[in-house]
Amino acid sequence: MDYPKMDYFLDVESAHRLLDVESAQRFFYSQGAQARRATLLLPPTLMAASSEDDIDRRPIRRVRSKSDTPYLAEARISFNLGAAEEVERLAAMRSDSLVPGTHTPPIRRRSKFANLGRIFKPWKWRKKKSEKFKHTSAALERKISMRQSREELIKRGVLKEIYDKDGELSISNEDDSLTNGQSLSSSQLSLPALSEMEPVPMPRDPCSYEVLQASDIMDGPDPGAPVKLPCLPVKLSPPLPPKKVLICMPVGGPELSLASYAAQKSSQQAVAQHHHTVLPSQMQHQLQYGSHGQHLPSSTGTLPMHPSGCRMIDELNKTLAMTMQRLESSEQRVPCSTSYHSSGLHSSDGVTKAGPLGLPEIRQVPTVVIECDDNKENVPHEPDYEDSSCLYAREEEEEEEDEDDDASLYTSSLAMKVCRKDSLAIKLSNRPSKRELEEKNILPRQTDEERLELRQQIGTKLTRRLSQRPTAEELEQRNILKPRNEQEEQEEKREIKRRLTRKLSQRPTVEELRERKILIRFSDYVEVADAQDYDRRADKPWTRLTAADKAAIRKELNEFKSTEMEVHELSRHLTRFHRP
């Protein structure tokens, strides 16, 4: 049945016209949200009277559904109501009780488990989780939006630009993003390509160095002559903490053996010099030959370092340094010698080792990038140059803390073991000496004479105690020790033997005991008779005995008692014969 939509008041006459009492009740309960929106003013008895004077207009207070949002329906209707009576009716409807009439439906009882919904609300758990994810994603988006571009960081002075002779610039970070001994391993090493641009005129000062490419070194005018590295235009400033050494590893392919060597001694000596060069022949050997003397193609492409690879680089660096230390102790290798000439710094060739075919096996020695920290603040920030980012630019300080926390998870077990050993050594070295303990009155101060006196005192105490013990004679006098002779002891033993033999010899035999009616075994008391075998579970023959059989058994037993055993006169009446 299609009912009309009820938005406002429904008076009695229209209700009478629509349907009878039962269908009206069904209609009001079936219309969920629509019936709630309307303020229903039905009398308790619809059949009572039809005139408006006799109509009872008490409000029927309906129970609100829990799924309905609270007081929205009443608020919506209250805009359409002008009188104060209707508002009071709305307030009366908010209570959960029904005013029962003659034809109103029965009051809905709440179940026993209705209060459980107040405690356990599993439908809200998923909402909480989704809110949590929303909060975290919003925070991440805010952090990402707050990240500044590399150009802004250059303007602020967080990053500095390093210009080569060729006009290309590479950016190094002032933070400790790449510290001593860090290797940059990628499929292609990012190195500046040769161009015919004129270098900017620069004063000769302490500078930061970049590793030139193997092709640049080989194609030079004199392959044997040392190549000078470009310098930064900087001013002289007072000396600052020691230089950072950045290690760039050239990677030729999967067959290239990756080995890193931290050339700290050579870098520390190189700090004092203003102009340094690298031998091109050594660079050729390093970049062109693999582990087994294979020719490797030199790659000239540039590849930027991503922030995600920085942590892996740190870990690679640690493990490579550890493996190099192990190799140094196990293998015989040619030491990396550093010699200074008038032209500048020379680095030794790769460590050679005989291969399987007799060919010299060449290990990779890492090329070193020396970064001068003397004039960090005086570096010019010019955005006109093209930049090829060789090194990784670090984020702001907030992200640094997060990365430090994550990097702590990557520490190897070997490093933890070394830390434990170091801490143990520190604890042992911090143990106080005997003199310190004596000064703090923890150990008493004693000379050799005092120790001898103490020993003598202890010895006299012991001898006095031993001398105070009673002698054997005193114990005999007190009857604690009894004097014993061997003859007396032997006589006592003989006496014991005689006593035992006499007892054994005087024991009567079994026959004598039977004659005296002193029986030893149970079989001597009972005459054994053969009995028929029967099933002890199923067959029970004594249940089949009649009264005459029982009387005969009793008579036989009493006769045996009267003949075999003497019965006392007072108990003879108990042995009388039973008549069958």
From Swiss-Prot:
Tissue expression pattern: Selectively expressed in brain. High levels are found in the olfactory tubercle, nucleus accumbens core and shell, caudate-putamen, cerebral cortex, hippocampus and piriform cortex. Moderate to high levels in the olfactory bulb, arcuate and ventromedial hypothalamus, subthalamic nucleus, amygdala, lateral septum, habenula and thalamus. Low expression, if any, in substantia nigra pars compacta/pars reticula and globus pallidus (at protein level).
Cross-referenced SMART domains: RPEL
Compartments it resides in: Cytoplasm; Synapse; Nucleus
Statement: the UniProt record of this protein carries the keyword Aminoacyl-tRNA synthetase: no
Chief localization: cytoplasm
GO CC term, one of those recorded: glutamatergic synapse
Keywords per UniProt: Actin-binding, Cytoplasm, Nucleus, Phosphoprotein, Protein phosphatase inhibitor, Repeat, Synapse
RPEL repeat ranges per the UniProt record: 138-163, 422-447, 460-485, 498-523
Modified residues annotated as Phosphothreonine in this record: 104
Chain positions of motif Nuclear localization signal: 108-129
Keyword Repeat belongs to the record: yes
Source domain of life: Eukaryota
Compositionally biased intervals (Basic and acidic residues): 471-494
One BP annotation, GO: cell motility
Pfam families found in the cross-reference section: RPEL
PROSITE patterns linked: RPEL (PS51073)
Oligomer and partners: Interacts (via RPEL repeats) with ACTA1 and PPP1CA; ACTA1 and PPP1CA compete for the same binding site.
Record function comment: Binds actin monomers (G actin) and plays a role in multiple processes including the regulation of actin cytoskeleton dynamics, actin stress fibers formation, cell motility and survival, formation of tubules by endothelial cells, and regulation of PPP1CA activity. Involved in the regulation of cortical neuron migration and dendrite arborization.
Family membership: Belongs to the phosphatase and actin regulator family.
Protein name as annotated: Phosphatase and actin regulator 1
Native organism: Rattus norvegicus (Rat)
